Amino acid sequence: MFRSGFIHNTRFNFSKVTTKRLFSSSARPIHSLRIKSLTLGVCGFSAITGLALYNHRLIELDNKKQDISPNISIAVDSSISPFPTALISANQTNLNTDFQLLGYGVRSVTFVNFKVYGIGLYIANDDVNKTKKILSPNYLSTFGTENHSLRELLSDPEFSAQLISKLLEENVRFAVRISPVRNTDFNHLKDGLIKSILAHPESKENKEIVSNGLEELRNVFSGYRGSVPKNHVLWLEILKQGSLSISYENPVKNELTSMGQVKEPIISKLLFLQYLSGKKPLSEPLRKSCNDGFIGL
């Protein structure tokens, strides 16, 4: 349904790169990474999962196990700042725990290949072991399929929904970083979330509950008007028991604003099912990248 805006061919050869922390209020010294020289042909978004490019600084990342140092960042789209691979709650004060990057991608409108925002999906560090147990062969064998491959089950519309639902039921916490690639406003961000939730089949089966939850979501946005410039950030965090915390980051002023919470858990459930499962996920590159992240845990 969605197509990446990164379509190019290029070749790189490098041996040493440096990166720096972006979102710490007390930035640490720049670290150096030594990476063996390589020549890499890149074509399309899916081929650059393991490669970050920012201001001529390159990082080679293993697709199956990313470096989650707080000093490492990932290039999601050339028009916005890279995303950190680790979120430290002591520095990222809008978050309630520490997170590591699970996957990332770009949300696009297919019929015009119109990029909307870059998105990164994170998993709570404290919930990684729980997730590994849920996604273990013992649990996967209960699906009654001949093939218990985690990758194939995560790629299957029906089984992926069951797996993600199980993670959410077991209170595995996730966070999402949304960064518009062009200027927008709070109203468009709110409408996008509402449309995504209503597009999930379960919303029709739970109309009253979903309606109440969406009213909470509208109330969270009710005090926020006006523009959201490109490269600003909307944060979504699933709390225990399924509440959804929403906050806004202005990187120019280095300000974080807590907007509020949606208490009804079906809202966070349907939204994250849309990100991680089903026939038509909100961003196929994000879903594929997160599948790699789950497998690499």
From Swiss-Prot:
InterPro entries assigned to the protein according to its UniProt record, in alphabetical order: Chalcone_isomerase, Chalcone_isomerase_3-sand, Chalcone_isomerase_sf
Record's protein name: Altered inheritance of mitochondria protein 18, mitochondrial
Compartmental location: Mitochondrion
Keywords attached to this entry: Mitochondrion, Transit peptide
Annotated family: Belongs to the AIM18/AIM46 family.
GO-annotated cellular components: mitochondrion
UniProt-listed Pfam families: Chalcone_2
GO terms of molecular function: intramolecular lyase activity
UniProt transit peptide range: 1-35
Highest taxon above the source species: Eukaryota
Main location: mitochondrion
